[in-house]
Amino acid sequence: MKNISEQKRKERGMTQQQLAAALGVSRQTIISLENGKYNPSILLAHAIARLFGTQIEDIFLFEEEEA
């Protein structure tokens, strides 16, 4: 799943470690998330959106898989 979490994090002047600490996850989770290799739980996605003051769908770009 594509997302703009890295862009939002940088706009706020946050490091990956600061974002991880604010969300209660590891820095590795943030790295994987920003690289599109990790799909967060709905709770984590909601926490990220809330932290950035936006909606989940504004951060995470859902793509339908081709059949």
Task: Give the label of every model feature segment.
Residues 18, 29, 58:
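Residues in the helix-turn-helix
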Residues 61-67:
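Short, charged recognition helix plus adjacent turn
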